[in-house]
Amino acid sequence: MSKQLLLGDEAIAQAALDAGLSGVYAYPGTPSTEITEYIQMAPITTEQNIHNRWCANEKTAMEAALGMSFVGKRALVCMKHVGMNVAADCFVNSAITGVKGGLIVIAADDPSMHSSQNEQDSRFYGDFSLIPMYEPSNQQEAYDMVYNGFEFSEKTGEPILMRMVTRLAHSRSGVERKEQKPQNGISFSEDPRQFILLPGNARKRYKALLARQDEFIKASEESPYNKYTDGPNKKLGIIACGIGYNYLMENYPEGCEYPVLKIGQYPLPKKQLLQLVESCDEILVLEDGQPFVEKHLKGYLGIGIKVKGRLDGTLSQDGELNPDSVARAVGKENKSEFGIPSVVEMRPPALCEGCGHRDMYITLTEVLKEEYPSHKVFSDIGCYTLGANAPFNAINSCVDMGASITMAKGAADGGLHPSVAVIGDSTFTHSGMNGLLDCVNENANVVIVISDNETTAMTGGQDSAGTGRIESICIGLGVDPAHIRVVVPLKKNHEEMRQIIREEIEYNGVSVIIPRRECIQTLARKKRSK
């Protein structure tokens, strides 16, 4: 087959298409977004009617993908690492139900928090869910793992978790494609109770899952993605996970002097681990993220050998790996340091010139500072989070998707007035609606600003689930229509916005203000395409 130059994300997408994908389900989030976008733009997606719409959130995406698997078809679900927290309910239980059609879950982790609130490691989710996991070291492996992973999922009857990291997701390499497979036809499980997790059946299926762990370990021991390479210097043995193997080989282009165990499939392969441990004086673990393998190694085999890595300070406990940090860990002299030259000015992200969020924040901050000095503003995840920076300095919190509304409610419950939430339209339909329902049920004294730019802007302008329907959703959740106020955030409407904000702060109950103006970047793209 042909060879293509692909991002890591694109390699995953192309592999899924080549493997007979029937549907991709996702909520946009860096660094996973490009997977779904690639599938959406691929001609074969239209030709073969492959489902490819964005979902309201990661939980609905995971559930829809499991439904696709239920009818015997192959499904891909994609999210960033924090999205796993949202999808976890269905994800963990899907390990117990198992699958019919192949199901691969992509969790794109973000070590160093380039565009995230934390750098949690998704391997822990796969571990406590007791399912097999993949972690590619390069783009070709990412392709191969997904292409073959659907068959592996169907063979094991389990979803497969694949962990990506930012540097691999957003870098390019040549990828050899394989032959195109047809989509599966509709078929159903021979066990009519497979997906019914009543306690009696759930206990039975959970015991069966536990009994299969040795089978999964054996699959890891026989996997081409786990490779033991001997070396003459036995003072150190190296376990290199995922992209960590790439960084190690960059330091040893002619071959490493130490024995190396490359890890690309989990659970950990016991035989290869024992081989490495028994032949080396010390073990160094290279993993991009939290010390997942390092922690397992200390208790996994009951070994007394010294293990080095993030926990003992050989590698930093936070941030991502790079070739230089790996070089230092193995005692090699650094020829060059990664870093930003001092002559390059920092360019922190900022709200675009002409963005409706700017006019919203200017007006909101003006009213609050002038008339309500005790105010607090609880914000959310999206472009408008940049209101934390100068010149606005407008928000007091940003924790997780949907937290703005519920934190504002909690603060109001504690006596804060005014308590203001700022949330975007896409984040509102992702995880803000439940919080609004809580506010309505208790008639909380909060002002909720749903800043509607009619898209999911922060991740590149994907469709927003609530576009054109925010008012209807709020009415459906029980908000008094008289206190749902829509305004166009422009300078000419500045006084109108001020008056609306004042009126709704003075109202004792739930108020929703919707500043609505199309994202300036979306508007620019439309003009360029004409």
Residue ranges and their predicted role:
Residues 40-45, 249-260, 472-480:
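Short helix-loop-beta junction
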Residues 78-79, 104-108, 161-167, 239-240, ...:
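Short beta-strand segments
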Residues 31, 82-83, 108-111, 138-140, ...:
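Short, glycine-/Ser/Thr-/acidic-enriched flexible segments
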Residues 1-13, 17-19, 136-351, 356-357, ...:
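Flexible, low-complexity linker and terminal segments
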Residues 87, 114-116, 170-173, 246-250, ...:
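Short helix/loop capping segments that flank catalytic or ligand/cofactor-binding pockets
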Residues 46-55, 97-108, 188-194, 441-454, ...:
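A glycine-rich helix N-cap at a beta->alpha junction
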Residues 1-139, 167, 257, 292, 386-512, 520-528, ...:
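Thiamine diphosphate
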